[in-house]
Amino acid sequence: MTNQLIYKGKAKDIYSTKDENVIRTVYKDQATMLNGARKETIDGKGALNNQISSLIFEKLNKAGVVTHYIEQISKNEQLNKKVDIIPLEVVLRNVTAGSFSKRFGVEEGRVLETPIVEFYYKNDDLNDPFINDEHVKFLGIVNDEEIAYLKGETRRINELLKGWFAQIGLNLIDFKLEFGFDQEGTIILADEFSPDNCRLWDKNGNHMDKDVFRRDLGNLTDVYQVVLEKLIAL
């Protein structure tokens, strides 16, 4: 059925289209933290996330990364290939921050010699627990070969993103990716890439991401607008 709500998320809603292999993603003016325990409506946030993610995915597509992104169709909407999402959050860390610093008792801002890739099991009831490769296989999420691909592709994407953000004066601290299987069974990059799911610090160490909301550091949309304008100028 066309225009039927398929999935209602914290930051995005997904609808069917006339093409069974294409979905319409609508970005919402909502910010959440602690797995939705804190929720707030922020006017304009959805449009900013959509535009930032669209720009990033367009660049990734051109760089040869296979993604679900098709096109942006309005300020807060885009068309994507329909995928079966892999229930993993793939996190890459270039610099210590956030939960990593808390978990291991290290200060924020320490540059990691080699970027660290982590897996989190996408399960709201379990609060998305941190898991390792053996857990991933035990749960039957993906196999050894697919685990290796997810890690390798995430590292490749990191090198591209780090370079682009460095050109606009931003340091890519860490980020979360999601992948899915397309209609041919190929793993492709899905979800979004915006300051909602990455950490960006400017040259002065100022947060240019969702930590502005998490830590009450200022106006979130003002910060996201700056990121968008920098990316447009790239």
Curated annotation (Swiss-Prot):
<keyword id="KW-0658">Purine biosynthesis</keyword>
<protein>
    <recommendedName>
        <fullName>Phosphoribosylaminoimidazole-succinocarboxamide synthase</fullName>
        <ecNumber>6.3.2.6</ecNumber>
    </recommendedName>
</protein>
<dbReference type="GO" id="GO:0006189">
    <property type="term" value="P:'de novo' IMP biosynthetic process"/>
</dbReference>
<keyword id="KW-0547">Nucleotide-binding</keyword>
<dbReference type="InterPro" id="IPR018236">
    <property type="entry name" value="SAICAR_synthetase_CS"/>
</dbReference>
<keyword id="KW-0067">ATP-binding</keyword>
<dbReference type="GO" id="GO:0009236">
    <property type="term" value="P:cobalamin biosynthetic process"/>
</dbReference>
<dbReference type="InterPro" id="IPR001636">
    <property type="entry name" value="SAICAR_synth"/>
</dbReference>
<keyword id="KW-0436">Ligase</keyword>
<dbReference type="GO" id="GO:0005524">
    <property type="term" value="F:ATP binding"/>
</dbReference>
<dbReference type="InterPro" id="IPR050089">
    <property type="entry name" value="SAICAR_synthetase"/>
</dbReference>
<dbReference type="InterPro" id="IPR033934">
    <property type="entry name" value="SAICAR_synt_PurC"/>
</dbReference>
<comment type="pathway">
    <text>Purine metabolism; IMP biosynthesis via de novo pathway; 5-amino-1-(5-phospho-D-ribosyl)imidazole-4-carboxamide from 5-amino-1-(5-phospho-D-ribosyl)imidazole-4-carboxylate: step 1/2.</text>
</comment>
<dbReference type="GO" id="GO:0004639">
    <property type="term" value="F:phosphoribosylaminoimidazolesuccinocarboxamide synthase activity"/>
</dbReference>
<dbReference type="InterPro" id="IPR028923">
    <property type="entry name" value="SAICAR_synt/ADE2_N"/>
</dbReference>
<dbReference type="Pfam" id="PF01259">
    <property type="entry name" value="SAICAR_synt"/>
</dbReference>
<comment type="similarity">
    <text>Belongs to the SAICAR synthetase family.</text>
</comment>
